[in-house]
Amino acid sequence: GVNMHQDHAGVGSAIPDALQAWRIKQLKKFGCNAYRASHNPMTPALLDICDREGILVINENRLMGINEEHLRLLERMIKRDRNHPSVIMWSDGNEEWGLENTIQGTRLAEAMREYTKLYDPTRPSTVANAGGTELIKGLDVVGFNYIVQNDVDNRKKANPDWKIVGTEETSGCGTRGWYFDTPEYPGRMISINRTDKPGVENVIERGWKFYDERPWAAG
């Protein structure tokens, strides 16, 4: 699967429907069968395409929160998209660093999870987690961004009933070359022109291998 932004070279975020369909077909050629909307709800036309093409979707809410506006946006996404068969899970947010290690984060995740179930009791909720230990306690499915930021094995050992999905594992920051032996950034992707050193913690092949070896986790 992939995390995809509503963005494409030459057109920006105003992607024509035909180009959306082309992108999905290219992903299928790679063997891709899942799509996480990052980090906002997908355009309805793209969901229609995923329905037709058999792509599994994690549809993502833009911001975590329980004030009137936060809940209005969450409700709008669910009501609009809940009849799409491609949607398998709702993501209530992404990498809320300020909340992930707090009891407030746990309570917020629980509240959003229960609010989501008011409008769709058939699908689970997740949040893409960047390494915290508290917010994830309030989720139906625990989403882990980057295995190097999350002690996934020990978390599962301590919480055997957890349902786990790898929600994000790498970023395509390099230009053309992949380097694994740079002393300053061992095991990371480095731009071929060496003008930039993106702080990317992992490469996708390692993530694939990690989740493939663990039948209790998807990713």
Kindly give the residue locations of the regions a language model identified.
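Active-site-adjacent substrate/metal-binding segments within catalytic domains
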Residues: 1-114, 125-126
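Structural motif corresponding to alpha-helix initiation and N-cap regions
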Residues: 21, 71-75, 148-149, 201-205
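Receiver (REC) domain switch/active-site residues of two-component response regulators
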Residues: 33, 140, 219
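Short beta->alpha connector loops
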Residues: 39-42, 130-131, 145-150
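Short hydrophobic/aromatic-enriched beta-strand-loop microsegments
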Residues: 54-62, 141-148, 163-169
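Catalytic metal-binding/acid-base residues of hydrolase active sites
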Residues: 62-63, 95-97, 121, 131, ...
